[in-house]
Design a protein with these regions (language model features):
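Active-site glycine- and acidic-residue-rich loops that bind
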Residues: 1-9, 36-38, 42, 64-85
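Active-site beta->alpha loop and helix N-cap motifs at the rims of alpha/beta catalytic domains
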Residues: 1-23, 28
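Generic structural signal for well-ordered alpha-helices
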Residues: 8-16, 40-51, 76-81, 128, ...
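Glycine-rich phosphate-binding active-site loops on the catalytic face of alpha/beta enzymes
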Residues: 26, 90-100, 146, 153-180
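Glycine/Thr-rich beta-alpha phosphate-binding loop at enzyme active sites
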Residues: 29-38, 76, 81-137
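Short beta-strand/loop segments at the ligand-binding rim of alpha/beta enzyme cores
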Residues: 56-69, 133-143
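Catalytic cores of alpha/beta
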Residues: 71-85, 132-137, 147-164
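C-terminal helical cap(s) of enzyme catalytic domains, especially alpha/beta-barrels
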Residues: 100-117, 170-195
């Protein structure tokens, strides 16, 4: 599109009355130049426009931003600042990765496309923890990347995620994985004497 920001605004206008929340995805590796929105000026312009559109619609729809895992320390700090300056409810950490392929064994590891699941779990977890420390509970964190068990989900909560999402785990284990994770989480919470998830969110720090 010649006006990519307007594409997002049209989506908000069309769906703000029916959606539970709207994701501003700036991180798909399969969409040309989409990750340019991680640049400070471009992201600020986008989220300012999104906030103004919400206000013009008198809408309370939560807006969350989905980021790439392939970002550096400077980008982490800038993104955190920009999120806090705008009417943003959450951040999804993270989309698929274009790096981390050298750890794979499959001969097709260098094919084009986003890498998901276990190979990006550590990168996702580190980012969750960094953003948790910067956002200080003011913006909700949705953790994604390598969730395939109650333990892997629990780890993301400990590092600062308020919610989790999964896809690759469901591909390999089927939709019943949600019930398995729920059961495992209940056992882990009981084991640790935890009565509410809020007690464990952000209790662990990665160096």
């Amino acid at each position: 599109s010649d006006n990519r920001i307007n594409d997002y605004l049209i989506g908000i206008e069309k769906f703000h009355e029916v959606a539970d929340y709207i994701t501003i995805n700036i991180s798909s590796p399969n969409t040309e130049n989409l990750r340019n929105f991680h640049d400070e000026r471009k992201l600020q312009d986008l989220l300012k426009s999104v906030s103004e559109k919400k206000k013009s619609l008198d809408s309370n729809i939560p807006i969350v931003v989905k980021i790439s895992p392939d970002i550096d320390e400077n980008q982490i700090n800038l993104i955190s600042e920009i999120l806090l300056e705008n009417d943003i409810s959450g951040i999804i950490i993270s989309n698929t990765s274009e790096s981390s392929r050298d750890i794979l064994k499959n001969i097709q590891r260098h094919q084009k496309g986003g890498l998901s699941g276990k190979p990006i779990e550590k990168k996702s977890n580190l980012l969750i923890n960094k953003f948790y420390n910067l956002l200080k509970g003011k913006i909700k964190i949705i953790g994604v990347g390598g969730v395939d068990s109650g333990q892997s989900a629990y780890e993301k909560f400990l590092l600062g995620a308020d919610y989790i999402q999964l896809y690759t785990g469901m591909v390999f284990q089927g939709p019943n994985i949600a019930s398995i994770i729920k059961k495992d989480l209940k056992e882990l919470l009981t084991r640790d004497g935890v009565k509410n998830f809020s007690e464990i969110i952000g209790n662990k720090t990665l160096s």
